[in-house]
């Protein structure tokens, strides 16, 4: 089976598919940015994904196929992240600048998010953890399914 478009997202309408048998394509976040790939479901079914250029990244809960009784969805593995809880705008700016110098991407969340606070989240890196410890910025290391994948930051001088 070749998947050429995303049919929706399970998280946006969970009740609509409650009676469907769910088959999962389990992916690390690094593969969410690939629009052409071969995958295998947790039931051993092989699928080809060939999404058109300009299609957004895959997301947790994306529906790849559906019929009257079955649904195949993307299930994203948790990512090892640092949840940074800067106490002031100055502290956040200094940390964000340091992450930018390392060409690390960060995602930002407000108090209404699942984090319950204004936080900055980046992929785990031991040098960033050492930096946060040395400057005394509060953080937690967690495993999280991120809403969008971290992308490799291109860089030139």
Swiss-Prot record:
GO cellular component, one term: cytoplasm
InterPro entries assigned: UreE (IPR012406), UreE_C_dom (IPR007864), UreE_N (IPR004029), UreE_N_sf (IPR036118)
Similarity field: Belongs to the UreE family.
Predominant location category: cytoplasm
Domain of life: Bacteria
GO molecular function: nickel cation binding; unfolded protein binding
Compartments (UniProt record): Cytoplasm
CDD domains: UreE
Role noted for this protein: Involved in urease metallocenter assembly. Binds nickel. Probably functions as a nickel donor during metallocenter assembly.
Gene3D superfamilies: Urease metallochaperone UreE, N-terminal domain, UreE, C-terminal domain
Name of the gene: ureE
Protein's name in the database: Urease accessory protein UreE
Lineage, highest ranks first: Bacteria, Bacillati, Actinomycetota, Actinomycetes, Micrococcales
Keywords carried by this UniProt record: Chaperone, Cytoplasm, Nickel, Nickel insertion
GO biological process: protein folding; protein-containing complex assembly; urea metabolic process
Pfam families for this protein: UreE_C, UreE_N
């Amino acid at each position: 089976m070749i998947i050429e478009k995303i049919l929706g997202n399970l998280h946006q309408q969970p009740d609509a598919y409650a009676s469907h048998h769910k088959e999962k394509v389990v992916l690390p976040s690094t593969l969410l940015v690939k629009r052409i790939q071969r995958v295998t479901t947790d039931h051993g079914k092989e699928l080809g994904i060939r999404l058109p250029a300009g299609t957004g990244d895959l997301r947790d809960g994306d529906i790849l196929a559906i019929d009257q009784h079955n649904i195949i969805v993307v299930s994203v593995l948790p990512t090892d992240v640092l949840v940074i809880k800067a106490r002031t705008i100055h502290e956040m700016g200094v940390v964000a600048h340091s992450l930018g110098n390392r060409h690390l991407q960060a995602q930002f969340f407000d108090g209404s998010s699942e984090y319950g606070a204004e936080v900055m989240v980046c992929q785990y890196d031991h040098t960033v953890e050492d930096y946060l410890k040395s400057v005394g910025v509060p953080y937690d290391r967690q495993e999280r399914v991120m809403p969008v994948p971290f992308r490799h930051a291109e860089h030139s001088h």
